[in-house]
Amino acid sequence: MQKKELFRRVLQHFESTMDSTETELHFSNPFELAVAVVLSAQCTDKRINQVTPALFRDFPTPEALAATTPEVIYEYIKSVSYPNNKASHLVGMGKMLMEQYGGEVPSTLEELIRLPGVGRKTANVIQAVAFGKAALAVDTHVYRVSHRLGLVPKSCTTPYAVEKALCKYIPEHLIGPSHYWLLLHGRYTCTARKPHCEICAFAEFCPSEVLGRSKT
């Protein structure tokens, strides 16, 4: 199957079966999204959604975060992965937002990756979800699904390479949603271990299914 046709079929299925939501994280503004995404690194969205209500209630603004300490934030997020590091990142992020961005979350990649705890993946999520930009975050799910479906060549061995390869074929208006679609497919269907190929809409043309690699 030609690459363009493969992308067309995959994206057509996602568009017709998935809603327009772009994250399972709960948030009400760009600041809350930034906090939630920083916390979500190597942790489940379900867990993050359990700790953020109290965190957002008591620290609703960058100013509030900047005025507290990592030790205080730790008590709110101690059930997530790497709570000490993330507590420091959040307080540092609050301070930088106040000191350099007027208390507002910036919208460009260059500015976002300057924030403590924010790398390219996190920045792309914020750009796409909070600001509607054509940015595609590549996490482990997106990376795995992209390779298994043959959307990207084997030579794409880094998240950045996968991001660039995907964006060559995904229409600009679907780049943001595609991150979430691929993520959900990897999270619930094309899982790392024992993928559910029997219910996968792409099984008939998935090279991993045909060659049996997806069952390893």
Language-model segments: which ranges?
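Catalytic cores of DNA base-excision repair glycosylases
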Residues: Q2-K215
